[in-house]
Amino acid sequence: MIGIDIVQIERIEQLIEKYGQKGLERFLLPQEMEVAKKPQTVAGFWAAKEAVAKALKTGIGKELGFHDIFIYKTEKGAPEFKLLNGKEQMFRIQQTALSISHDAGVAVAVAVIIRC
């Protein structure tokens, strides 16, 4: 299954300006906030979480929340994700792939998920 999302970086900048750290805590885990220092990185993480939720055909809501999706970077800087809080078993995840990019004022993410 494939999910994709795109977000304007300016939208994330406005969220940060208006709500600050509390705004970020609504959708980022503490470990993610350590990595996502720039608005374009935050926007990429937002898009990635939305893309994962779309790939699972659930969206963000009761079944899957922002804090159930952990976005991280490998040693080489490639983005990856894990589902937390038992969601990996619930959705029967076998294999995943994630790509995040940002350019021209937008961040885009594509998530690929293979289920058992």
Swiss-Prot record:
Main location: cytoplasm
Assigned keywords, A-Z: Cytoplasm, Fatty acid biosynthesis, Fatty acid metabolism, Lipid biosynthesis, Lipid metabolism, Magnesium, Metal-binding, Transferase
Gene3D superfamilies tied to this protein: 4'-phosphopantetheinyl transferase domain
GO annotation, biological process: fatty acid biosynthetic process
Residues given in the record as Mg(2+) binding sites: 5, 50
Catalytic activity: apo-[ACP] + CoA = holo-[ACP] + adenosine 3',5'-bisphosphate + H(+)
Localization annotation: Cytoplasm
EC code(s) of this entry: 2.7.8.7
Single Gene Ontology MF annotation: holo-[acyl-carrier-protein] synthase activity
Cofactor requirement: Mg(2+)
Entry annotated with the keyword Transferase: yes
Assigned GO CC terms: cytoplasm
Transferase among keywords: yes
Class in the EC hierarchy, top level: transferase
Primary role: Transfers the 4'-phosphopantetheine moiety from coenzyme A to a Ser of acyl-carrier-protein.
Membership in a protein family: Belongs to the P-Pant transferase superfamily. AcpS family.
Family matches, as HAMAP family: AcpS
Protein name: Holo-[acyl-carrier-protein] synthase
Gene expressing this chain: acpS
